[in-house]
UniProtKB/Swiss-Prot annotation:
Keywords: Aminoacyl-tRNA synthetase, ATP-binding, Cytoplasm, Ligase, Nucleotide-binding, Protein biosynthesis. The gene is leuS. Pfam families: Anticodon_1, tRNA-synt_1, tRNA-synt_1_2, tRNA-synt_1g. GO terms for cellular component: cytosol. GO terms for biological process: leucyl-tRNA aminoacylation. Its main location: cytoplasm. This is Leucine--tRNA ligase. Residues 1-20 are annotated as: Disordered.
Length: 876
C-alpha cells in the first residue's frame, strides 16, 4: 500500500458519518447484556466548548468505548443544563430572547462535540429548558409537595443585588454571589424549600458506601452535612436585665465540658433578644443591620472580622448561679444554626479568643494536653481546641474531656429550670434545607397558584406543564414574570375565583439533580419509567469537576432519595463511581502592568527559546510580552485554546490523545503546543507503521506465537493488553498511553520486516495479531485513526462494533521474577532470576551478588531460606 500521511480532515468526518448511519451508539433498553452507565456532567450551553470540556468528555468516551468493546450494554447520553442567569443577562445586553440565545448556543456546541467523535447516544438528548423536560420536573415537585418534602416559609435569604435573585448558602463565596461576584445582602422573603434535612443522617451514613468516590469529596460532604453531638443548655437570664417576658436563653454546644471556661454568650442579630435590645438602643440596631448585610454562609462568617455589641443582658452560669456572664450580639452567630445563640469559651476556640481579647473578656484555660502541667499551662494568642485533661474546672479537674462532657450532660439533664431539664443531649446538623425559589424568568416555573380564599393551591397534574410565556421583556432588572400582563393571572383550581401564579422559578440546581434519571427513558410520558430507571441506576461512572462536590452532588443524592420516596426510582444513590478530573491550564501572556495590563491570547504570540530561555513575542509587531503564571483557561485572561482550531489543525484524535496522555487524569494538564505536536506525531507514526505493513498483512490470519522468534512480539502485545485493561478500568489514561508508546516501539522493527516481505507465516501471524491489539488499545482514545487502521488491515465491519481482544494467559506470565534479598531480616539487595530457577540456582545467584558479598564481609551464612518466587532470607 502506498503510504500517505494520515489526513484527519478526511477520515474523521467520514467515520463519524458511518457511526451515525449505523446507529452504533444508540442504546436499547431491552438489551439483556450487563449494563454500564457512563456520564459526564452535562454542559451549560454558553456558546463554545473549551479544552476542559474536551478532556472531560474524552475521559468519559474512553470509558464508554472500552466498556462497549468489553461486551456491556453501554448508556452514554448527552444533554444541556440550559436554564440560568447568563441567558437572561444576554437578553438584557443583546436584546435576544433567552430561548433563542440558548438554543443557538446548543446548536454550536453540539456541532463541536460531534466533531470530537464522541460515542454519544444523541437520540436521548434534551435540554432542561425544553418544556418536555421541565413539565416532568413540575410533576416531581408536586409529588414531593404531597409527600411533605416541600414547604414554604418566611426566611432570611441571600440576595444578589446584581442578578436580582436569591442564592443558596452554597452559592455565596466569600460573601459574594457565585456568578455575579456582587456583595450579597440579606432579605426576608417567602421561599420554597426542599426538606433535604429529612435525610441528613442517611446522606451522612451512606457516604461510607460510596467507596468508588474520591475520599476528598466524601469528606467535603461529611463536613457540609456537619453532624455534631452536643447539649442544649438553658441559661437563666438575670431578672433585672431581662427584656419583658423573657426568662432564659437556650444554647446548643458541642463542648459542654468547657463550661467553666465560658466568659460570654453571643446571639445572632435576628435572635428575639437581639431584636428587643435593638428596639431600645440605636447603636445595637445599627450593628444588627450591619450583620444582616453580611453573607450568611458559614465560610463567609469564619473569614470576617469578629464583631459584637453588649446587649446589657446578663445570664447565670448553669453550674454556678452566682456567676453572671454578659450577652453580646455577634456577627459570627447564625440564627438558623443550632438555636441562634452560643456560649464563648475563649481558651478553647480561636474565634472566641479573638473576640474576648478584642472586648476585654476573661480567658481561663480549662483543657490542657494529656502531658501538660496544670500549674503552668495557659493560653496566649492561640486557643487550645484539642482533647485532653480538665483544669480550672472545679469538680471536673483531672477528668478527660469525654468524661467531663458526660458528667456535665448528666448533671444538667438532672437539674431543672422552670420545671424543665436545664440540659438535653441533642444531635445537630450543619446542613440546612434547600431554598429553591429564584426571582427570575429563565427557570422551571413552580407549579402552584396563590388564591386569596384557598391559600397556596398546587396546579393539578392534568394542567401541567406550566409553560413560560414567550412574550417577555428584559428592559429592566428583576423577574419579567412579575410584570407580565396576563401570564400570572389564572383561576383558582379549587374555587374558580381569580388567583395568581407563583412567579418564582426553581433553582437551576434542581434541573441537574435528576437529569441522569431522565436519560434512562427520555421519551416517557411520566418523569421516569421505573423499570428503565431501576435497570440503569446508579450511574456506574460519573465524571466532572470537584467544584461540584457539595452543590450538585449532594443535591442529586437528596433528589434520588426523594424520588425513591415518591415511587419514581428504587435506587438510593445516583452515582456508584465518581471521578473528578483536573483542569486544563495554560500560560498567561500580557503587556503593560497594573490597571493598564492587557491580556494576550496564545494564538497571537510565538514562543522563542534561546539557550534555555523562553520569550513570548507578538506575531504582529514582534514586541516582547510578559509570560505569566500557568492558570485555568479563562476568557478574561485570554489564555484559552479553541478546540475547533486544534481539530482543524491536527484532528480530534490528536486533541483527545494529548489531554489524556500528558498527566494523571485527576491532576491539571498544562496545555502546550509542543505537547499537542507530540501527540500528532504519534498518530502519524502509528498510521505509518500500520499502512506500510498493511499489504503484507491483509491476507494474514492473526495468531499469537507460542515459540520461536515471534514469541517476544506476542508477549509484548498481550502483556500490554493486560496492563492497559487494568489502566482503563482504573481510569489511568496516562499510564495506558505510556504503555502504548512502548508497544509501538516494540512493534516498529517487526512491522518494518513484514512490510519488506520478511518473516515466515508464524511471524506474520504474530505481527498481525499484535497490530490488531495495538489498534484496539488506542481505539477508545483515538477512535477515527483506529477505524482507519482497522480498515487498512482488511478487516470488515466497524471497529466500534468489534469485541475487545483477549490476552493469552501463557503469554502474560513474566519469565523473570524479582526477589528481595534480606540478611537477618533487613533488605540488602534484589535478585532478578528466571521464574523456573531451582533453589540451588537461586542460592548461588544470591551469593554472587556484590551487595550480598559486601554485607557478608567474608562470613559464611548460617542458613539461606528461599521462599519460591517470593523472597530470599540469609541468616548470619
Amino acid at each position: 500500500m502506498a503510504t500517505e500521511r494520515y489526513n484527519p480532515r478526511d477520515a474523521e468526518p467520514r467515520w463519524q458519518q458511518k457511526w451515525n448511519e449505523d446507529k452504533v451508539f444508540e442504546t436499547d433498553n431491552s438489551d439483556p447484556r450487563e449494563k454500564y452507565y457512563v456520564l459526564e456532567m452535562f454542559p451549560y450551553p454558553s456558546g463554545r466548548i473549551h479544552m476542559g470540556h474536551v478532556r472531560n468528555y474524552a475521559m468519559g468516551d474512553v470509558v464508554a468505548r472500552y466498556k462497549r468493546a468489553r461486551g456491556y450494554n453501554v448508556l452514554h447520553p448527552m444533554g444541556w443544563d440550559a436554564f440560568g442567569m447568563p441567558a437572561e443577562n444576554a437578553a438584557m445586553e443583546r436584546g435576544v430572547h433567552p430561548a433563542s440565545w440558548t438554543y443557538q448556543n446548543i446548536g454550536s456546541m453540539k456541532a463541536q462535540l460531534k466533531a470530537m467523535g464522541l460515542s454519544l447516544d444523541w437520540s436521548r438528548e434534551f435540554a432542561t429548558c425544553d418544556v418536555e423536560y421541565y413539565q416532568h420536573q413540575q410533576h416531581l415537585f408536586l409529588d414531593f409537595l404531597e409527600k411533605g418534602l416541600v414547604y414554604r416559609k418566611q426566611s432570611k435569604v441571600n440576595w444578589d443585588p446584581v442578578d436580582n435573585t436569591v442564592l443558596a448558602n452554597e452559592q455565596v463565596i466569600d460573601g459574594r454571589g457565585w456568578r455575579s461576584g456582587a456583595l450579597v445582602e440579606q432579605r426576608e422573603l417567602t421561599q420554597w424549600f426542599f426538606k433535604i434535612t429529612d435525610f441528613s443522617q442517611d446522606l451522612l451514613d451512606a457516604l461510607d458506601t460510596l467507596d468508588q468516590w474520591p475520599e476528598k469529596v466524601r469528606l467535603m460532604q461529611k463536613n457540609w452535612i456537619g453532624r455534631s453531638e452536643g447539649l442544649t443548655i438553658r441559661w437563666e437570664i438575670v431578672a433585672e436585665t431581662a427584656p419583658a417576658g423573657e426568662t432564659e436563653i437556650t444554647v446548643y454546644t458541642t463542648r459542654p465540658d468547657t463550661l467553666f471556661g465560658a466568659s460570654f454568650l453571643a446571639i445572632a442579630a435576628d435572635h428575639p433578644l437581639a431584636k428587643d435590645a435593638a428596639a431600645k438602643n440605636a447603636d445595637i440596631e445599627a450593628f444588627c443591620e450591619e450583620c444582616r448585610r453580611a453573607g450568611t454562609s458559614l465560610a463567609a462568617l469564619e473569614t470576617a472580622e469578629k464583631k459584637g455589641m453588649d446587649t446589657g443582658i446578663r445570664v447565670r452560669h448553669p453550674l454556678d448561679p452566682s456567676w453572671e456572664l454578659p450577652v453580646y450580639v455577634a456577627n459570627f452567630v447564625l440564627m438558623d444554626y443550632g438555636t441562634g445563640a452560643i456560649f464563648g469559651c475563649p481558651s478553647g476556640d480561636q474565634r472566641d479568643l479573638d473576640f474576648a481579647r478584642k472586648y476585654g473578656l476573661p480567658v481561663v484555660a480549662v483543657v490542657m494536653p494529656q502531658d501538660g502541667d496544670a500549674a503552668s499551662f495557659s493560653v496566649g494568642d492561640t486557643a487550645y481546641d484539642g482533647d485532653g485533661v480538665m483544669i480550672n474546672s472545679r469538680f471536673l479537674d483531672g477528668k478527660t474531656t469525654e468524661e467531663a462532657f458526660n458528667i456535665v450532660a448528666d448533671r444538667l439533664s438532672a437539674a431543672s429550670l422552670g420545671n424543665t431539664p436545664q440540659g438535653e443531649r441533642k444531635v445537630n446538623f450543619r446542613l440546612r434545607d434547600w431554598g429553591i425559589s429564584r426571582q427570575r424568568y429563565w427557570g422551571c416555573p413552580i407549579p402552584v397558584i396563590h388564591c386569596d380564599d384557598c391559600g397556596v393551591v398546587p396546579v393539578p397534574k392534568k394542567d401541567l406543564p406550566v409553560k413560560l410565556p414567550d412574550d417577555v421583556t428584559f428592559d429592566q432588572p428583576g423577574n419579567p414574570l412579575d410584570r407580565h400582563p396576563t401570564w400570572r393571572h389564572v383561576s383558582c383550581p379549587t374555587c374558580g375565583k381569580d388567583a395568581r401564579r407563583e412567579t418564582d422559578t426553581m433553582d437551576t440546581f434542581v434541573d441537574s439533580s435528576w437529569y441522569f434519571t431522565r436519560f434512562t427513558a427520555p421519551w416517557e410520558a411520566k418523569p421516569t419509567d421505573p423499570e428503565a430507571a431501576n435497570r440503569w441506576l446508579p450511574v456506574d461512572q460519573y465524571i466532572g469537576g470537584i467544584e461540584h462536590a457539595i452543590l450538585h452532588l449532594l443535591y442529586s443524592r437528596f433528589f434520588t432519595r426523594a424520588m425513591r420516596e415518591t415511587g419514581h426510582v428504587a435506587a438510593t444513590e445516583p452515582f456508584k463511581g465518581l471521578f473528578t478530573q483536573g483542569m486544563v491550564v495554560h500560560e498567561t501572556y500580557s503587556r503593560g502592568a497594573g490597571g493598564s495590563r492587557e491580556w494576550v491570547a496564545p494564538a497571537d504570540i510565538r514562543i522563542e527559546e534561546i539557550d534555555g530561555k523562553r520569550r513570548a513575542l507578538l506575531l504582529t509587531t514582534g514586541e516582547e510580552i510578559a509570560i505569566g503564571s500557568i492558570e485555568k483557561m479563562s476568557k478574561s485572561k485570554k489564555n484559552v485554546v479553541d478546540p475547533d482550531d486544534i481539530i482543524a489543525s491536527y484532528g480530534a484524535d490528536t486533541a483527545r490523545f494529548f489531554v489524556l496522555s500528558d498527566s494523571p487524569p485527576e491532576r491539571d494538564v498544562i496545555w502546550s503546543e509542543a505537547g499537542v505536536e507530540g501527540a500528532h506525531r504519534f498518530t502519524q507514526r502509528l498510521w505509518r507503521l500500520i499502512s506500510e505493513a498493511a499489504d503484507a498483512l491483509s491476507a494474514v490470519a492473526p495468531a499469537p506465537a507460542t515459540e520461536g522468534e515471534a514469541l517476544s512480539i506476542s508477549q509484548a502485545a498481550h502483556r500490554t493488553l493486560k496492563a492497559v485493561e487494568n489502566d482503563y478500568d482504573k481510569l489511568w489514561f496516562n499510564k495506558a498511553v505510556a504503555r502504548i508508546y512502548e508497544l509501538v516501539n516494540a512493534l516498529a522493527a517487526p512491522m518494518t520486516r513484514v512490510a519488506a516481505g520478511e518473516g515466515d507465516a508464524t511471524y506474520r501471524a504474530a505481527v498481525r495479531n499484535a497490530a490488531e491489539i495495538l489498534i484496539q488499545l488506542v481505539a477508545p482514545m483515538t477512535p477515527h485513526l483506529a477505524e482507519e487502521c482497522w480498515m487498512a488491515l482488511g478487516n470488515e465491519g466497524l471497529l466500534a462494533r468489534t469485541g475487545w481482544p483477549q490476552y493469552g494467559e501463557t503469554l502474560v506470565i513474566e519469565n523473570d521474577v524479582v526477589l528481595p534479598v534480606q540478611i537477618n531480616g533487613k533488605k540488602r539487595a534484589e535478585l532478578t532470576i528466571s521464574r523456573d530457577a531451582d533453589q540451588n540456582a537461586v542460592t548461588n545467584a544470591v551469593l554472587d551478588l556484590d551487595a550480598v558479598k559486601n554485607a557478608l564481609n567474608g562470613q559464611a551464612p548460617k542458613k539461606i531460606i528461599v521462599v519460591p518466587q517470593r523472597i530470599v532470607n540469609i541468616v548470619v
